Amino acid sequence: MRGKRVVLPDKDHQACGLFGVIDRSGRRFSGEMAINAMINMKVRGNGLGGGFAAYGIYPEYKDYYALHVMFQDWDMEAKHRVDEFLDANFDVVYAEEIPVNPEANVASPPLFWRYFVSPNKKGDEKKLSDDDYVVKKVMEINTKINNAYVVSSGKDMGVFKGVGFPEDIAEYFMLAEEYKGYMWTAHSRFPTNTPGWWGGAHPFCILDWTVVHNGEISSYGTNKRYLEMFGYYCTLLTDTEVMAYAVDLLMRKQGLPIEIVSKIFAPPMWDHIDIMDEKKKKFYTALRMNYGPLLINGPWTIVVARHGEMFGITDRIRLRPITSGEKGDLLFVSSEESAIRAVCPDLDRVYTPMGGEPVIGRLKSREKELAKQLSEVE
């Protein structure tokens, strides 16, 4: 006789909620839309992580890198060391504690400060680009100063995240009241293999790249070791961190477009490559041979953003959901259509992309810039 099936209703490995919205005209708006979308998907999280990334929020300091730094357990020795480190390696034009609402429903929040800085390169480091210099210094803080973590490091943008439901984190950082941006991404976390702690909440960020992720990256070990060869080190105890560093390496440092990066993360199966025409077969074989360590295995969906553009993509067989919608200049990506319709009921278009195919939204100014670059190449 077969045994009785045991159902564990509290064991759910298919959760996490993702949302992203960009106004392609560049119009800035508050975080309320992203907050309400995440409230609609509250059942996708369990209160152990929520967060937002916002772009265009610091126009008065838009030419400076905005470092959001988290000090675990309010470690003032760590803060003192970070202050000294930044003074030695950057020109700090302004620094302050990030304003918060102490009445918000969050547990044991750490200390958050923001620093607006420009690089102060010396010696051989003068050979580095400003971006490479900032990445190097962020890695030094995250790996060498205990209890200090740089959670975002781009210009005119910031990440706000922590332990709680997304609406709790939004209330804590006062995102609806204090900030306006032209693009927002958001995440509701349901941790499965890693702890629910403030640094492990999404988004993950390096420079202005941010990633929110639903799923499980079973190739994390291989991805992590490959990225370490290029100076990227994972310190935040979750697999998603590799995605932020991978897009920085591939798109910023190596100059690959989203369309090719999507095929590195989610390439065609070998049996599909075998039946392609010769040109495509050579192309995809070269991608898989050269970038095999950055193939992302497992069930996953990600929304990636940087200044001027955002894209969402799933694994090649869509084991985690993503849906997109458009209304005028607004482009949405989300784990659920219901979240999009909760904030924009009258959509012009709704569609679900194929597995491994990116949904891309760009500022109109960015589209014109890319078109000009393409015409110059041709």
From Swiss-Prot:
<dbReference type="InterPro" id="IPR012375">
    <property type="entry name" value="Glu_synth_lsu_1"/>
</dbReference>
<protein>
    <recommendedName>
        <fullName>Uncharacterized protein AF_0952</fullName>
    </recommendedName>
</protein>
<keyword id="KW-0315">Glutamine amidotransferase</keyword>
<dbReference type="InterPro" id="IPR017932">
    <property type="entry name" value="GATase_2_dom"/>
</dbReference>
<feature type="active site" description="For GATase activity">
    <location>
        <position position="16"/>
    </location>
</feature>
<dbReference type="Pfam" id="PF00310">
    <property type="entry name" value="GATase_2"/>
</dbReference>
<dbReference type="InterPro" id="IPR029055">
    <property type="entry name" value="Ntn_hydrolases_N"/>
</dbReference>
<feature type="domain" description="Glutamine amidotransferase type-2">
    <location>
        <begin position="16"/>
        <end position="378"/>
    </location>
</feature>
